[in-house]
Every structure is written in structure tokens, then in C-alpha cells.
Amino acid sequence: MFTLRFDMRAPDWAGPPADLYGAAIDMCAWAETRGAALAVLSEHHGAADGHLPAPLMLASAIAGRTRTLAILLAAVAIPLWDPVRLAEEMSVLDLISRGRVWYAFGVGHRREEFEHFGVDMTTRGRVADEMLAVLGPLVRGEVVSYRGRQVRVTPACATAGGPMVLIAGGSKAAARRAGTHGFGFVSQTALPGLKELYESECRAHGHEPGMIQFPVEGAPTTVFVAEDVDEAWDVLGPHLLHDAIMAASYRPGDDSVASISRADSVAALRAESGGPYRIFTPNEAVDYIRGGRLLPLHPLCGGVAPDVAWPYLRCAVAAAARAQG
């Protein structure tokens, strides 16, 4: 079993964006009957390499080409959205996908993105809590009082109770937010005490703790599978390094997030012991999956051209099938 992640980075020297978007949709359609458990789409704005800014739109295209594949949007920076408009898009996407799209909401962390939308970053926590309080009722079609006006979103979503919502973050504030609102919690860090804080906040507000996920020490977050690992690093290395450098630039001075690498060369990235970027042999991929873990594939990482990406994806899927055999 494996997951697919798409950030849609397209640096100038990589594949054309239109080809990458088409390939992402094709890959999801192809992979859903071959062991794909989940497609993960991220959201960032104003990035020099075109990082995906509209995950709900891409999710809609993927949902239209698939029938069973779950799609997680992680993380959506909720203070950058208008809650009424977001609820409308979530409701329609829930209808299109028949409930297969889930959301991990965060408060955002790049000052440039708040400036991009003219939003005050210093109020992001308060704004997020205000929006989370009304978003659920809105997608369920209830009348909501929001900032002095009565609002009702139509059509209501198809999923009873609304789409699955998680809170993404790695801080005590994120754990409290998830518990207060009764949502699941996806932590990007392994900060001690977060799990206990989340569970206590849930129960203090009348909720049973929901889905919870923490990073596993030494586990990769981006994987390719290749028969010839040396050749694969030669081909894929510049793309993986670009992804690593860009992701690290989003979090200057913050090394607490499991997916962040500070490598400044392909050699350094490859040499990281237990680092987030790995290229497995098929046998290593089989062993990883048989250890009870999902293989986190990132087929178009750093703008890998589709004709280059497909053979690596097929190799990974073949290994996943063998692991299940």
C-alpha cells in the first residue's frame, strides 16, 4: 500500500506545469486500482516554483477521474480563506467526490502568504478558531450567524456531519485547537505531551479523541523506488534537492518538522541518515510495506517530468503489489 503526494512544484528548468497537472490526475486514476490508499495535495501561495495554490480545484479534477481514492488536502491555511466561500467549495467537492475528500486545516506559517492576501498574520489563531466554529454548520446547510449576518450555504454536503476535518500543526496551540473543536489531529512534530494535551482538550470539551497522527522518527516522507538507486539519484537528485531547499525556506530556523531537510547538495541529501528523502530498491520497498507502513510516494517531486516519473511510479507499485502477495 502507498500514498501519493502532489505539491505541483514546477521550477523553470523542470517539466511544463500543464504536463505536470495532467500527469498528477492520470497517476491518481491509474493508481487507485493498484493499491493507492490516499492522494495528498498541499497548498501554498506565491511560491517562485508555482507550488499548488488551489488544492480544491485539483482535488475536483482528481475526484472526477477516480471512484474510490481518498483525497487529503494538507494543510489548508484556513485564515487565508473566507469561511462562507470555503464552505461552498467544500460542499460541492463533497458532492462531486461522494465524500472522499478530507481536510487538514492549519493556521499558516509563511508571512509572504498573508501579505499575498492582505491578511493580518498576528490574528491567525483567533481567526482560525472563529472560522472553525462556523465551518461545520455551514457545510451541513445550517443557518449560521457570522460577523453580524445570517448565512446559509447551499447545496449542503452529501456526507452526514460534513467532510472529515483534521487540524494540522506541531504546537500546543494546534493540539488545543483540535481538541476544542473535536477534530482529529495531525502533528508535524514529535513534541512531548502533545498527544496527552490533545486528548485532554477533547474530553474537556465533550468530544472523544479522533484520528491522531505523529511523525515516526527516521521514517521518510518522500520515496521513489528504482532498480538502480545510483542512477536514480543522478536523475532525481536535483528535483529532490529543489523540493528540500524550497520546503526548508518556508520554515527558516525551524527544524522541528519531520519533513524538513537542511541539505544543500544532492550528495548531502542522499547521505542523511534517516532523512526525509529516500530512493529504495524494490526489495527495500517491499520490506518497508511489510513492516506495516504506507510507502509515501511523491511522483512529480520538484517538477520531475512525467515521462521520467512514470517508470519510477510503476516500479514502486510493482513492489507494493509484491509486498501484498
Predicted features by range, described:
Residues 1-66, 70:
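N-terminal beta1-alpha1-beta2 module of alpha/beta enzyme domains
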Residues 2-6, 39-41, 71-74, 101-105, ...:
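Hydrophobic faces of well-ordered beta-strands that scaffold small-molecule active sites
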Residues 4, 33, 122-155, 194-294, ...:
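An alpha-helical appendage that flanks or caps ligand/catalytic pockets
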Residues 8-21, 76-84, 161-169, 223, ...:
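Active-site mouth loops of central-metabolism enzymes
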Residues 12, 46-50, 78-81, 252, ...:
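Short, small-residue-enriched loops and turns at beta-alpha junctions
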Residues 18-30, 89, 169-176, 281-289:
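Short, acidic/polar
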Residues 82-181, 186-201, 205-213:
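Internal, glycine-rich beta/alpha segment that forms the wall or movable "lid"
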Residues 296-324:
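Generic C-terminus detector
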